[in-house]
């Protein structure tokens, strides 16, 4: 009898202990199959590793440390952005960015590189929130690319250019570079918004970027062709050659769906062509920054007389590129909001 009373009393205490306690929450599901997300989020030949939509923001930040099909894209550019911050700290110890007017383009290219890398990392991390945020974050990504394009053009024009090429293009180079950077952003945003399939969509996105790259890299290519100095006397040339090779490799993987098309269903986490594109683009950026830094240090006797008088305010053009690209992305985001609102009616 006493034993039965004790057991009932123990059961009562246990029940009281659990009163008011929340039941244990199940672990969130971080990835789902492609069939469980809208077609907007689908990647060719990638059938799993997608993140569910309409979770809270904390969920998507937590996926930074989870396995999903955007994780490598996030980390490649996030780590590179952190490396650039360390590089900038190192440069600040030896370069007087405040007092040396010729150091400003060097600061701009580091800032522009950090901008595109960080915007890209944020876009790939948070774009799965919803259809609206998918569009908006990739529009932000395209703004970063436009800023980087103009920053690259400025650095090449200021430090890498040969006097003979400078004489030919000085009046039009930077304004044209700013226009093409904006056009690249606008074309990419419009292609994303319109979702045009096939060749036409690729033309909207890739043709302006290709034109911008041809102009932006022209001082480097001209110098590689005409430079009489051997590589050991001009070490920046090796880095410039590397950045060209890395960019072309990056462009090849961006424009195709290799290698996932060779192994359908096997590249959910690793091995996607866009991941390889990210890696080569990071290598291109790092090689470019080393080349530009070496040019800043070693070619002052060449670039200082060339830029004694400026036909254009490059700081103003830089800000114009940032502002026009940002406004374009904002406008397209509002068009997306309207389109999605009409779809839900």
UniProtKB/Swiss-Prot annotation:
Which stretches face the Extracellular side?
Answer: 96-102, 158-168, 265-268, 337-345
Transmembrane residue ranges: 75-95, 103-123, 137-157, 169-189, 244-264, 269-289, 316-336
Keywords for the protein's UniProt record, in alphabetical order: Cell membrane, Developmental protein, Differentiation, Lipid-binding, Membrane, Oogenesis, Receptor, Steroid-binding, Transmembrane, Transmembrane helix
Its annotated function is as follows: Plasma membrane progesterone (P4) receptor coupled to G proteins. Seems to act through a G(i) mediated pathway. May be involved in oocyte maturation. Involved in neurosteroid inhibition of apoptosis. Also binds dehydroepiandrosterone (DHEA), pregnanolone, pregnenolone and allopregnanolone.
Tissue localization of expression: Detected in most adult tissues. Higher expression found in white fat and liver than brown fat and skeletal muscle.
Record's protein name: Membrane progestin receptor alpha
In the induction comment, the record states: Up-regulated in PPAR gamma 1-induced adipogenic liver.
Per the record, ranges on the Cytoplasmic side are 1-74, 124-136, 190-243, 290-315
Main location per UniProt? membrane
Q: Which organism is it from?
A: Mus musculus (Mouse)
- GO MF annotations, alphabetized: steroid binding
Per the record, membrane topology reads: Multi-pass membrane protein
What family does the Swiss-Prot or TrEMBL record give for this protein?
Belongs to the ADIPOR family.
Cellular component terms (Gene Ontology) = plasma membrane
């Amino acid at each position: 009898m006493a034993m039965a009373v004790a057991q009932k009393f123990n059961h009562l205490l246990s029940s009281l202990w659990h009163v008011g306690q929340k039941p244990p929450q199940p672990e969130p599901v971080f990835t789902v199959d492609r069939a469980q997300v809208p077609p907007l989020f689908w990647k060719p030949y990638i059938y799993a590793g997608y993140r569910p939509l309409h979770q809270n923001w904390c969920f998507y930040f937590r996926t930074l440390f989870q396995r999903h099909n955007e994780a490598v894209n996030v980390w490649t550019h996030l780590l590179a952005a952190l490396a650039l911050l360390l590089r900038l700290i190192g440069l600040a110890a030896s370069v007087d960015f405040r007092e040396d007017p010729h150091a400003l383009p060097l600061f701009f290219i580091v800032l522009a590189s950090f901008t595109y890398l960080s915007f890209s990392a944020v876009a790939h991390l948070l774009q799965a929130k919803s259809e609206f945020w998918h569009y908006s974050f990739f529009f932000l990504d395209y703004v970063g690319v436009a800023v980087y394009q103009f920053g690259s053009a400025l650095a090449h024009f200021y430090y890498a250019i040969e006097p003979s090429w400078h004489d030919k293009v000085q009046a039009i180079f930077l304004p044209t570079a700013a226009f093409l950077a904006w056009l690249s952003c606008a074309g990419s945003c419009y292609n994303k918004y319109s979702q045009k399939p096939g060749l036409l969509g690729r033309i909207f996105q890739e043709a302006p970027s290709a034109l911008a790259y041809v102009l932006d890299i022209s001082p480097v290519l001209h110098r590689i062709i005409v430079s009489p100095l051997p590589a050991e006397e001009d070490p920046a040339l090796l880095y410039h050659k590397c950045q060209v090779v890395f960019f072309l490799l990056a462009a090849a993987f961006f424009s195709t769906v290799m290698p996932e098309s060779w192994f359908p269903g096997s590249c959910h986490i690793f091995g996607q062509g866009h991941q390889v594109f990210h890696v080569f683009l990071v290598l291109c950026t790092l090689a470019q920054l080393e080349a530009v830094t070496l040019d800043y240090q070693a070619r002052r006797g060449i670039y200082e007389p060339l830029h004694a008088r400026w036909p254009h305010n490059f700081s103003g053009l830089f800000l114009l590129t940032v502002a026009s690209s940002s406004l374009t992305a904002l406008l397209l985001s509002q068009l997306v909001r309207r389109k999605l609102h009409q779809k839900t009616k």
